[in-house]
């Protein structure tokens, strides 16, 4: 692992919507990697490919996002320090000191290092260098609603066999559900092999959890392959106390390499299924009436319930459905839920 190159990347400012410097830096880096072809689209997303496939092969694809939430400053000073061994969200479980990276401004004040998701970017670049056949995607403006990945070049995905995103904190997280999208089937060869590889690479038992939103959920809607999001070594994200565990980044790189060794250049299909959030009182009706392969989760809230939008928007019974929320969810008053349920049910029957 080239620590100097990692620190160089971390020093490039990349606040959301101000990512030009980072994109230029990445294109310069890609120019120097032998055997790699790349391009950027009109959104400034960057796509890179290495190696030529044989008949029946598919590329593994690794992705991350180029933006951070931190205020853009002229110069980010990255320093190596030692902290107690971190666990997710900065909690410690022993007194062992480990090497970490932290960021400061030129006045010596702590600032966000942007490990979310510069760790992911660095890991993707390292895998591009070390693997023979691979694709990577680096997407802009994830932090404000996955704007880059939602408008990605779908043609780039057509020969991809599975997708891995590096955009979870710590060293023991795997995202199964993201933005109302299930990324993989737990009862599958893909997950069985991936879980074993990631667990061995990090040396931790992995926690399979839900992630609020990130780019892989947008790609999953566009391609019917298994996807996953995993930890990549940043802690205390979105704060000036953010730091990066160097060892965890190394483990994440090894996890990616080992995934490709074990999974190979195969396609691991998994059909996109929306997850519908409904009041518990009508959740059973959804399951019984639809008899479809749709995941249904229910929960109660005092004022509002949450339902995922299903691509088509219309007016019916005085209810206007729109994609006003960037994360793909609507907030619907209780009194509208009964008639809304009929609309959703009708759509799902047509769609599936």
Per-range role (PLM):
Residues 2, 31-35, 42, 55-59, ...:
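Short glycine/proline-enriched coil/turn segments at helix->beta-strand junctions
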Residues 5-8, 12-56:
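A non-catalytic alpha/beta surface segment that caps or lines the substrate-entry region
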Residues 207-252:
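Zn-dependent metallopeptidase/amidohydrolase metal-coordination segment
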Residues 287-352:
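Positively charged, low-complexity terminal tracts
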Residues 57-133, 143:
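Active-site metal-coordination/substrate-binding segment of hydrolases
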Residues 178-223, 272-275, 296:
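An extended, acidic, His-containing surface patch that forms the Zn2+-binding/catalytic region
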Residues 109-186, 208, 216:
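Acidic/histidine-rich catalytic neighborhood of metal-dependent amide-processing enzymes
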Residues 236-292:
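His/Asp/Glu-rich mid-to-C-terminal helical/loop segments that flank catalytic regions of hydrolases
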């Amino acid at each position: 692992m080239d620590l100097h190159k990692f620190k160089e990347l971390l020093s490039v400012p990349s606040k959301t919507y101000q990512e030009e410097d980072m994109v230029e830096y990445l294109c310069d880096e890609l120019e120097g990697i032998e055997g790699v072809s790349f391009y950027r689209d009109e959104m400034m997303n960057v796509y890179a490919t290495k190696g030529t496939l044989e008949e029946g092969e598919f590329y593994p694809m690794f992705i991350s996002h180029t933006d951070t939430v931190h205020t853009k400053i002229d110069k980010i000073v990255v320093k190596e320090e030692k902290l107690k061994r971190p666990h997710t969200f900065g909690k410690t479980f022993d007194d062992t000191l480990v090497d970490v990276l932290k960021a400061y401004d030129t006045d010596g004040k702590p600032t966000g290092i942007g490990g979310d998701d510069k760790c992911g970017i660095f890991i993707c670049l390292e895998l591009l260098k070390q693997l023979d056949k691979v694709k990577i995607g680096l997407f802009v403006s994830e932090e404000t609603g996955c704007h880059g990945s939602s408008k990605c070049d779908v043609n780039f995905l057509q020969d991809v066999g599975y997708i891995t995103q590096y955009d979870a904190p710590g060293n023991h997280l795997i995202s199964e559900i993201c933005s109302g999208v299930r990324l993989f089937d737990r009862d599958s060869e893909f997950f069985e092999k991936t879980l074993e590889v990631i667990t061995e690479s990090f040396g931790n038992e992995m926690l399979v959890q839900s992630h609020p939103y990130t780019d892989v959920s947008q790609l999953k809607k566009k391609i019917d392959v298994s996807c996953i999001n995993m930890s990549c070594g940043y802690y205390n994200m979105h704060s000036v106390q953010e730091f990066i565990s160097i060892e965890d980044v190394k483990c994440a790189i090894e996890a990616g390499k080992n995934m490709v060794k074990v999974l190979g250049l195969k396609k691991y299909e998994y059909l996109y299924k929306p997850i519908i959030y409904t009041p518990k009182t009508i959740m059973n009706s959804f399951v019984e009436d639809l008899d479809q392969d749709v995941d249904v989760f229910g929960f109660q809230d005092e004022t509002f319930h949450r339902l995922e939008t299903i691509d088509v928007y219309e007016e019916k019974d005085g209810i206007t459905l729109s994609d006003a929320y960037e994360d793909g969810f609507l907030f619907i008053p209780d009194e509208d839920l009964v008639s809304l349920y009929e609309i959703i049910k009708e759509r799902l029957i047509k769609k599936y």
